[in-house]
Amino acid sequence: RIANAFIEQSEFDLAIATYEKGEKLMKGQFHFTYNLADLYRRKGETLTMLKYYVDGLEDGSINSMSLQNVLAAYLEPDKHKDLRALLYEKLESKPDFIPIIEILQWTFIQSKDFLNALRQAKALDKRTGENGSRVMYIANIAANEGDYKTAIDGYGYIKNLGQSGGYYLEAYR
């Protein structure tokens, strides 16, 4: 409530201090990473905002789909590089953390870098055993955007999974 009162008065620094104090008092039992990220967004501090959003993925206070929606609405395309740098940094300590890989894949899609998006999709597919659903998604986007080389690569991956994969026949179309 106190932080919200500060936000209503556009006193973002006081709201930030309130959330930070709340986290200390809660001793890690509750995280305000999403709230802090939003406040830094309002202040125009993009790098700090991104850091908190990525931390929110890690502490579970935000999921990758929600973060994609927020980033689509508020992140300028020229800041995707900064986000990728944070994601790669986080992946060094948590290479199998799927939400980070999902956001990384999303940044490549937004930048129309379908080859790197496909690489991430393949990595996720191998880790999760999803039978190619993410790969098929990226391959279809690449084909629709005219990146046929990447699309063919994705469809080839699906074909190599064999007929037991749910997208085998669709990959042949």
Question: What positions do the PLM features span?
Answer:
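Acidic, polar-rich low-complexity tracts and alpha-helical solenoid repeat scaffolds
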Residues: 1-173
